[in-house]
Amino acid sequence: MSLKAGDSFPEGVTFSYIPWAEDASEITSCGIPINYNASKEFANKKVVLFALPGAFTPVCSANHVPEYIQKLPELRAKGVDQVAVLAYNDAYVMSAWGKANGVTGDDILFLSDPEAKFSKSIGWADEEGRTYRYVLVIDNGKIIYAAKEAAKNSLELSRADHVLKQL
């Protein structure tokens, strides 16, 4: 079941997440993963959740994530409360990737979709179990924009510039 504008964000969606901490800000520092209840956390916020095939991969690292970091002030100006990036990598890798990109605090959450469970449930994961490149904009629990890229290395519909035009 893929999601589309007008749908409710599903209930019971949990991701794995390591919250950023000042005392564990070095890339080699290790935090403790927690369950991040996305259904609850996204219920009363405007959220941009973008997914990609994997941390530290070429298109994701060179273009996708850096553009969201750069465009964060513009997204906030358009009323976005939370930006989150999602991949099948475990929470430790996602946490290190956030640190490698200089993201501190909860400006952008680096979330793990263990075994691509959520992405598979909406039909947006490949046969290898990697998340597709996609974006969901959720406003108070309702999907207002949903798009999946046509190919793994495509970066059009889910890029920050395109999402800004949808807000």
From Swiss-Prot:
Catalytic residues (positions): 60 (cysteine sulfenic acid (-soh) intermediate)
Classification via InterPro entries: PRX5-like, Redoxin, Thioredoxin-like_sf, Thioredoxin_domain
Domain Thioredoxin as annotated: residue spans: 3-167
One of the protein's GO biological processes: hydrogen peroxide catabolic process
Lineage summary: Eukaryota, Fungi, Dikarya, Ascomycota, Pezizomycotina
Further facts: The active site is a conserved redox-active cysteine residue, the peroxidatic cysteine (C(P)), which makes the nucleophilic attack on the peroxide substrate. The peroxide oxidizes the C(P)-SH to cysteine sulfenic acid (C(P)-SOH), which then reacts with another cysteine residue, the resolving cysteine (C(R)), to form a disulfide bridge. The disulfide is subsequently reduced by an appropriate electron donor to complete the catalytic cycle. In this typical 2-Cys Prx, C(R) is provided by the other dimeric subunit to form an intersubunit disulfide.
The protein's role, per its UniProt record: Thiol-specific peroxidase that catalyzes the reduction of hydrogen peroxide and organic hydroperoxides to water and alcohols, respectively. Plays a role in cell protection against oxidative stress by detoxifying peroxides and as sensor of hydrogen peroxide-mediated signaling events.
Molecular-function GO terms, alphabetical: protein homodimerization activity; thioredoxin peroxidase activity
Organism of derivation: Penicillium citrinum
EC numbers on record: 1.11.1.24
UniProt record similarity statement: Belongs to the peroxiredoxin family. Prx5 subfamily.
Protein's recorded name: Peroxiredoxin Pen c 3
Assigned GO CC terms: mitochondrion; peroxisome
Regions crossing the membrane: none
Subunit structure comment from the entry: Homodimer; disulfide-linked, upon oxidation.
Catalyzed reaction equations: a hydroperoxide + [thioredoxin]-dithiol = an alcohol + [thioredoxin]-disulfide + H2O
Pfam families with a match to the protein in the record: Redoxin
Keyword Translocase: no
Assigned keywords, A-Z: Allergen, Antioxidant, Disulfide bond, Oxidoreductase, Peroxidase, Redox-active center
